[in-house]
């Protein structure tokens, strides 16, 4: 039976939006366990509102009406123009923004609730001035309770809070900005952004318990709490899902970085914000008893909010609050001491293997006072670190525990986990090994046992094989998924991160990676450079602090004849950029790579990534003034120029090549060319000549001074004799 014909544009619009009802309700593809949890957190969010939680529930959402066809068409065109950002200058864009705001006056609530036009409001917020943000805040005032619960308007509220937060800090630092009303409306009432935020919180605080588990409002509430606390909100945030849905569409402006990622620096906030935050935390704790708080711990939407409240409570108001009976942490874990058989013990044991609850347990371990953490660790985890590390979910809890252990406890935990390394590698659970390595290095714990286990597990016919840890096969076809795309699996990413951590260690552990990379065939090295995940390890190896000249020379020479094609590859081009830094002390090899780039000039200039490599290697200067490029290249590559292998320096054959170079440099037995020896000899002669000249000048000054003193004493003697005669 033929399928129903659907318009391509509408289908593409739905795919781009990622926020419509059909996308959420559609049956998702079979994913990993963690991804299923994220999907369930959206699909089942409303179901949890029927849990027996004693909260004040708001009424039905207000309907604000719809835009007519002409208005929708205008705002869609305006959205496209802002997205393309093809204005002559900022002034032209500001005039356009003003005209759009004028057209939207009185229709802001309709636009925010519109599936097709709410994106326009988000882009307007990204480019708005403080006065325009305040005006929009005032238009939303009194309607925030409805807006934060709406599928589309909630995104506008998030954007408004994020981009209005710096204005609060600006007004705090420069109070004079509040003295003059906006020039566009001299009769406008002056209101601070601080007051607007406090009005918003006052509007929502009666329904906080309900909003914590609302599928849309929970995200907005968490952003509002971060703004009130003054905490940073960075795009590198590991716990991004705590604040923002993974399905959130990125709305940005072409040619700018604004809006592509949420970035909010740590900033001072008014005292009223911290007071409001404390009041909110206390209200949340008083609204919910121990049973309901523990229910939120496994709630897909309530859990992230509970994590944030717990973290802010302990970070901003002191870890002594753990003793306060009305605090969130004390209500969740009221037993003192927390021992087996208590309700608190049952609660903790229930969180360890729960895909949602374990995230709250990680936050408790990370933020709890030292006394409480030690009590929890010794009672529940001290003898179980090995078994915890094996589990897919509990392994992340074990990682957080390792980050807080002292040297003695860490050494004991390390010995438990080392025994599980073969099992961990077999199950692709290498993230915990990476964390263990990092903590042992930080605490100065002996890592020889870890090194021995890793060497045994990843060894092949030719000894340690880095391709095993990077999950790269000699056959390129095996490195692709069934759909033909590169494999970006978490297991492969974790393997690359583990290899990079090993290279950061100066000694036998790092030597495993360096020596294995140096033994790769040119074909496999090129394949490694083209792999988006494994190439990160190669970049780190070429720029590593402990990478020797010998290793870098061997590694870079494997790319000879392939530099042009690698510079055109999105992943391998970054390796070619790293070669620039990797040729420090190898000026001749740097020039050899530049020659290959010059031979492929036309193809490089036609490619986006190729042009980036051309620019980073300063190839325009190479083409115009090669002599100047060579001089600069030799200067930045080091004064030693090309360094040869120390083949007859008497090093033991058991010493790895890149360690031999390090030992040779320590003895000062570095090979020097004839011209360098001549320069050194000339410099030594010049220093000797200056010393002799300085000594001569000093001697002459001393003789002159002695002569002057003798004349003065002679004249004084004559004067004295004359007086006696008289």
Curated annotation (Swiss-Prot):
Q: Which molecular function term from Gene Ontology is one that the record holds?
A: RNA binding
> What InterPro entries does this protein map onto?
ARM-like, ARM-type_fold, NOP9, Pumilio_RNA-bd_rpt
Is-annotated flag, keyword Lyase? no
Q: Which SMART domains match?
A: Pumilio
Q: Where is this region: Disordered?
A: 1-52, 640-726
Q: Name one GO biological process term.
A: endonucleolytic cleavage to generate mature 5'-end of SSU-rRNA from (SSU-rRNA, 5.8S rRNA, LSU-rRNA)
Q: Biased composition, Basic and acidic residues: where in the chain? A: 10-35, 685-700, 706-726
- The reply on keyword Repeat is yes
Gene3D superfamilies, from UniProt?
Answer: Leucine-rich Repeat Variant
Naming one, the record's GO cellular component terms include: nucleolus
Q: Which domain of life is it from?
A: Eukaryota
Q: Where in the cell is it found?
A: Nucleus, Nucleolus
At which residues are the Pumilio repeats? 103-138, 139-174, 203-244, 343-378, 379-419, 519-557, 558-595
What keywords were assigned to this record?
Answer: Nucleus, Repeat, Ribosome biogenesis, rRNA processing
Q: Mind telling me which Pfam families this protein's record contains? A: PUF_NOP9 (PF22493)
Q: Where is the composition biased (Polar residues)?
A: 640-667
Q: Which family does it belong to?
A: Belongs to the NOP9 family.
User: PANTHER family annotated for this entry?
Assistant: NUCLEOLAR PROTEIN 9
Q: Briefly state the protein's biological role.
A: RNA-binding nucleolar protein required for pre-rRNA processing. Involved in production of 18S rRNA and assembly of small ribosomal subunit.
Protein name from the UniProt record: Nucleolar protein 9
Encoding gene (name)? NOP9
